[in-house]
Amino acid sequence: MSRIGKKIILLPTNLSTQFDGQTITVTGPKGTLSRTLPAGINLEILNDTIAVKTSGQTKMASQLHGLSRTLISNMIEGVSNGFFKKLQIQGVGYRSQIDNQDLILSVGYSHVVKIKPPANIEIKVENNTNITVSGIDKEVVGQVASTIRSIRPPEPYKGKGIRYQGEFVRRKAGKAGKGK
C-alpha cells in the first residue's frame, strides 16, 4: 500500500465533489475539474474527507494508488487556490508582450513566436521580461510553461533564454582562444 495513497484528503468547505463510476468532479470558486480514475481505484467520500482505496491487490492498482491520491489533491488545490508558474526572459533585445490573449515572444529569431494559451489558462506579462502562467489545472499550467521555456531554453555560456523563476543555470567558461 502506498504511503502517499494512505493519506486522507481534507475537503475545504467551499468545494463540492461528485463521484460517478470512475469519474470524480470537483467544483470550487475558481472552476470545475473532472478526471477519470484508473480501474482498481475507488474513493470513499465521507463528510469533508476523501479516502483513496484500491480494489484488490493487483500490481497496477498498487502503482496508481499514490498517483491517484495526488491527482485528486491537486484538483482540489486548483479549484480552490489555483496554480501558477513564473518565467523570466534574459538576453539583450529579448522581450514578450500580450496581443489579445496570445503571448508574443521576440527571443532572437528572425520572426516573432506566437503562443495561444489553452482554455482556462491565463498568461500575464510584467516588464516585458516576466511571464506568469496561471490556471486551475496543475498539469496544463506546467505544460504551457514548459512549452514557453522550450522556445529558447537558457544557454550555458551567457545565460540568455527563457528560464523558470529561481532556476539555476549552470554556466560554462568560453573557449580559451589562441594566444599570440
Swiss-Prot record:
GO terms for biological process: cytoplasmic translation. GO terms for cellular component: chloroplast; cytosolic large ribosomal subunit. It is found in: Plastid, Chloroplast. One of its GO terms (molecular function) is rRNA binding. Pfam families: Ribosomal_L6. Gene3D superfamilies: Ribosomal protein L6, alpha-beta domain (3.90.930.12). Its main location: plastid. SUPFAM superfamilies: Ribosomal protein L6. Keywords: Chloroplast, Plastid, Ribonucleoprotein, Ribosomal protein, RNA-binding, rRNA-binding. Binds 23S rRNA. Part of the 50S ribosomal subunit. NCBIfam families: L6_bact. Belongs to the universal ribosomal protein uL6 family. This is Large ribosomal subunit protein uL6c. The gene is rpl6.
